Amino acid sequence: MWELVALLLLTLAYLFWPKRRCPGAKYPKSLLSLPLVGSLPFLPRHGHMHNNFFKLQKKYGPIYSVRMGTKTTVIVGHHQLAKEVLIKKGKDFSGRPQVTTLDILSNNRKGIAFADYGAHWQLHRRLAMATFALFKDGDQKLEKIICQEISTLCDMLATHNGQTIDISFPVFVAITNVISLICFNISYKNGDPELKIVHNYNEGIIDSLGKESLVDLFPWLKVFPNKTLEKLKRHVKTRNDLLTKIFENYKEKFRSDSITNMLDVLMQAKMNSDNGNAGPDQDSELLSDNHILTTIGDIFGAGVETTTSVVKWIVAFLLHNPQVKKKLYEGIDQNVGFSRTPTISDRNRLLLLEATIREVLRIRPVAPMLIPHKANVDSSIGEFAVDKGTHVIINLWALHHNEKEWHQPDQFMPERFLNPAGTQLISPSLSYLPFGAGPRSCIGEILARQELFLIMAWLLQRFDLEVPDDGQLPSLEGNPKVVFLIDSFKVKIKVRQAWREAQAEGST
């Protein structure tokens, strides 16, 4: 009896103990690890994971490994090593690990964000980038679309003059409409029931993915009942059903001679492939309806909640730092005034606002840990060997809070991105990658930067953003899920007197 138990344990240890492909190679230091459970018993159980990994650097250095269940994961916490992974050896490390929850979200690894490296991912990323090229100028210029939605946002907020509100949903609506126009030329009216559906499934997906799920570490557990997985599946189905409805309706309107949005680009690519008019890398099997819908879903998922969250973080930090907010108002008044609305060209004049956005992206990165990468081949990071199939996580929090790179990294200091005279934007450190880098960098970076600048410039021009009368300031602790969320808070919205007077003069 005991001999059989011992034999079973030895067999499990052999199967699940980390194996080195190159016995003589030098590997990163590793946390203690046990068969089956890996390093889990030795990881801190309290606090945010990104911060815990950052603290472990003091003992293990800027690169080390942990055993997450049965998989080896290398944690990278220095900008030079991170750029080696993302840029210098970007192709080596451009794979994506297979993760149960993300497989559900991506309809079995389709789309862009969570798809593994290969022909499918390359094709869909290229087509998505081609879509953004449609919005460079003319009536479809990205800035024009963004400003149209911000104008509607500001008009809605003005109806709450003097009130204390949560700006989350109004900002969500504006950004959803920008993404929706880019994807399929649809802009939702306030009160449209589909908006609520999008908002609900979006929140449900983020909440489900934010729960630490053992099934991601031990995939065999998915055979057992799992409330989190079932909830995720329900919300993904709701998303897929809505996108399918939009897609089916749009098929009747599609014209190959009028390509104006992402759905047009993807459908044209599919048509060309079906007709034999595409290159060898454009296989029609990679452009099925399911592939197309997942890519659209990726753009929605990546483009809405991220920017909405950053806008809220910016407002929260301004409520905590009224002296910065005061200077921002002065900059708006002096450089833009009230006879026109802010434009992207004002970036060159509203330097403190741009610096504030950069500082918020540093101190509260959208994703404190970038989506995990996977080694496609046997490779190396720095002096250390990394075997094919190894997972690699860039701890962006560590890069953005390194005391050797940033003066008082836990302090909100927008001026760090300005020269001493405040007349020029600077890069104070190379340890700054808010949108990632390399082959897997955020394809919506230009869109996000424009949205953040324009939304904040318009809000500051029109409204006083004040702490509620009860003095309740937002918590800056945050809740790191797929996106680093800020806890719900309220802000007192007041139409600025100078704006009101300028509008009165203009109407006479």
Curated annotation (Swiss-Prot):
Its cofactor is heme. It is found in: Endoplasmic reticulum membrane; Microsome membrane. Regulated predominantly by intracellular cAMP levels. The 17,20-lyase activity is stimulated by cytochrome b5, which acts as an allosteric effector increasing the Vmax of the lyase activity. GO terms for biological process: glucocorticoid biosynthetic process; hormone biosynthetic process; progesterone metabolic process; steroid metabolic process. Heme binds at residue 442. Pfam families: p450. Substrate binds at residue 202. Gene3D superfamilies: Cytochrome P450. Keywords: Endoplasmic reticulum, Heme, Iron, Lipid metabolism, Lyase, Membrane, Metal-binding, Microsome, Monooxygenase, Oxidoreductase, Steroidogenesis. It comes from the Eukaryota. It catalyses: a C21-steroid + reduced [NADPH--hemoprotein reductase] + O2 = a 17alpha-hydroxy-C21-steroid + oxidized [NADPH--hemoprotein reductase] + H2O + H(+); progesterone + reduced [NADPH--hemoprotein reductase] + O2 = 17alpha-hydroxyprogesterone + oxidized [NADPH--hemoprotein reductase] + H2O + H(+); pregnenolone + reduced [NADPH--hemoprotein reductase] + O2 = 17alpha-hydroxypregnenolone + oxidized [NADPH--hemoprotein reductase] + H2O + H(+); 17alpha-hydroxypregnenolone + reduced [NADPH--hemoprotein reductase] + O2 = 3beta-hydroxyandrost-5-en-17-one + acetate + oxidized [NADPH--hemoprotein reductase] + H2O + 2 H(+). Coiled coil: none annotated. InterPro entries: Cyt_P450 (IPR001128), Cyt_P450_CS (IPR017972), Cyt_P450_E_grp-I (IPR002401), Cyt_P450_sf (IPR036396). GO terms for molecular function: heme binding; iron ion binding; lyase activity; steroid 17-alpha-monooxygenase activity. Its EC number is 1.14.14.19, 1.14.14.32. GO terms for cellular component: endoplasmic reticulum membrane. Pathway: Steroid hormone biosynthesis; Steroid biosynthesis; glucocorticoid biosynthesis. Its main location: endoplasmic reticulum. PANTHER family: STEROID 17-ALPHA-HYDROXYLASE/17,20 LYASE, STEROID 17-ALPHA-HYDROXYLASE_17,20 LYASE. Belongs to the cytochrome P450 family. A cytochrome P450 monooxygenase involved in corticoid and androgen biosynthesis. Catalyzes 17-alpha hydroxylation of C21 steroids, which is common for both pathways. A second oxidative step, required only for androgen synthesis, involves an acyl-carbon cleavage. Hydroxylates pregnenolone to form 17-alpha pregnenolone, followed by the cleavage of the C17-C20 bond to form dehydroepiandrosterone (DHEA). Has 17-alpha hydroxylase activity toward progesterone. The 17-alpha hydroxy intermediates, as part of adrenal glucocorticoids biosynthesis pathway, are precursors of cortisol. This is Steroid 17-alpha-hydroxylase/17,20 lyase. It comes from Papio hamadryas ursinus (Chacma baboon).
